[in-house]
């Protein structure tokens, strides 16, 4: 290629100083080599959408920071020098707008394709890169393209206004070797390459800014005139015997209560405030698997984020993370309890739309909410809702409330023209600021109503909260899910949105279980969850420091060597470092004697720590069950281990949203036993597994993770067998009473141990698994062996308490 003109060189050198002051950009992804799988040993060139020295210099800064080649350094191939960047369109001037592909770009593509023809080993990687000056979405009704070239004065204004809100987006590489091998190397291929890049750039802009935003008044007018809402207004007027105009005003007020009023400037300001806040209270935010979501956004998917709900912080954290990962903050379904001054208006402008706790007896509200949600989907705005319905008070994932999921599928039944994908999100913290309040609520204290005073009191408590985690789980493409589950679903498409086919409820329930399972699959293990799990497993909630480190190391090794899922994450530090870090969060009592440190939990902290243990209990449930069986039996055949796991697994799967299918269990048991043997906790001779007496404590503490859950199952099954005449409601009530008694006598503090809802779900699983018949009566021939097996798995003193309590119930 010919050498660069001195004019361009002079222009760039003059721009460097002002740009170093005015421009502070963010690269997306922050680590493009790893996230985009770029091979740094292969030659690289960059493709930019428009001819612009400002964009090129901004790209240069971020490419070098990321460890990529300098775009202004020539590319040497077979002794020839090539320019390392191409522009896909010329920059417009004030007088003309040339959007054609520049001839020098076509020439460069053509020459590089020729080089591939001559050298079969050559593979030049083209990295499409876009420099976005500001991410403000357009207004509805504007017909401008998403990505526009800026002339000189426009670019100067953009740099002044948005230099510190600049985004450099690197896209997945395009292999010129693949292009040459698949499509040939003639001149038309160079044009095709340019066209592909142009489409790509438009999608990048859409993914970063989102679709054009509606004017609120226009949105209201459109919805109020929709056939479904007009019909609901007429029905409301008729049923309440009020004038039509009064019903219309009621509908307008409902819409005003629900609808978001998204403001980009508030999001931009909020980003700075939240950045300060996270740096003040968290030592770091760990974000995983965001690249998967970016790809979905770029491919034009309608994204529905479905996070678990641990804290009010979740609302802010996920929007902040998405914005920083170069995506649009979603419209968030928030509980109406958060619509108080001043938080309500701020949340609303940040994208929140408000939802009442119940739609019962409010057909007008139900229709308006459904229509509003369908409008968000139709226009392509990403949406977020917490399907647990409220914050988890115990740290365990709650069964999903399925209303929003059903409305999502109903929106699809209107014939959406883009694929809809659920993105499960696991949000984890080393400290949940409301955890003390949750413990009080579980002990019977009334939930405090959200208000400005409560917010200020919470803000005063902000201090060192350790690490925060946002893990994006495996997406669930809804079109694909429906094709597999209900192949004929498209026959029920109804543009009016009134379609409620028979398959809806069972399909939504199946989807809800899959969604919650994918959230749990993406769990983040951290220092606090590991230490809480180990300390709570010891009878006195206390361990010598060395033993705590050894126990944490056992858990880490199990999770590293038998990975739970592809989306769960583990800390990279050693067990010793993790214990040190957990200690720094001031949750433990540390006492020192002549033999070393003892780390313990006081009574209050041991209740709070169950929250963090429950965040990861599902990851260790199966190895814990195997360990408990070995502790109780000392020596047992592999076949017996597999049979016991198979017998109890359906209950654990339902309660903890475990991911494995029944047919995977035998192999999984062998892998866990092999890992326990590798750690020296057991020995395997032939088909027999035997406990290593020298390592009993580690195995015992591992087994005790799941022991409270097994005690709950033992109560329910043995009550069922000894009182077969009791109905389902009575069984649930009596089980809860026995559990409360057992908790008091044996010092069990875990709030979920006495939870009526957990027992209710357990009896549903008993029926599904054939331990209860259709009338809810005990099937003794299946229930009796399981009740005996559960008794065998729990400690004798606990078994005696349960037996004594059941005798009193039976009496």
From Swiss-Prot:
Keywords: Acyltransferase, Cell inner membrane, Cell membrane, Lipid biosynthesis, Lipid metabolism, Membrane, Phospholipid biosynthesis, Phospholipid metabolism, Transferase. It catalyses: sn-glycerol 3-phosphate + an acyl-CoA = a 1-acyl-sn-glycero-3-phosphate + CoA. The keyword Oxidoreductase does not apply. It comes from the Bacteria. It is found in: Cell inner membrane. It is a peripheral membrane protein. Its EC number is 2.3.1.15. Pathway: Phospholipid metabolism; CDP-diacylglycerol biosynthesis; CDP-diacylglycerol from sn-glycerol 3-phosphate: step 1/3. Its main location: membrane. A motif (HXXXXD motif) lies at residues 308-313. InterPro entries: GPAT/DHAPAT (IPR022284), GPAT/DHAPAT_C (IPR045520), GPAT/DHAPAT_LPLAT (IPR041728), GPAT_PlsB (IPR028354), Plipid/glycerol_acylTrfase (IPR002123). GO terms for molecular function: glycerol-3-phosphate O-acyltransferase activity. GO terms for biological process: CDP-diacylglycerol biosynthetic process; fatty acid metabolic process. CDD domains: LPLAT_DHAPAT-like. Pfam families: Acyltransferase, GPAT_C. GO terms for cellular component: plasma membrane. The HXXXXD motif is essential for acyltransferase activity and may constitute the binding site for the phosphate moiety of the glycerol-3-phosphate. Belongs to the GPAT/DAPAT family. This is Glycerol-3-phosphate acyltransferase. It comes from Vibrio cholerae serotype O1 (strain ATCC 39541 / Classical Ogawa 395 / O395).
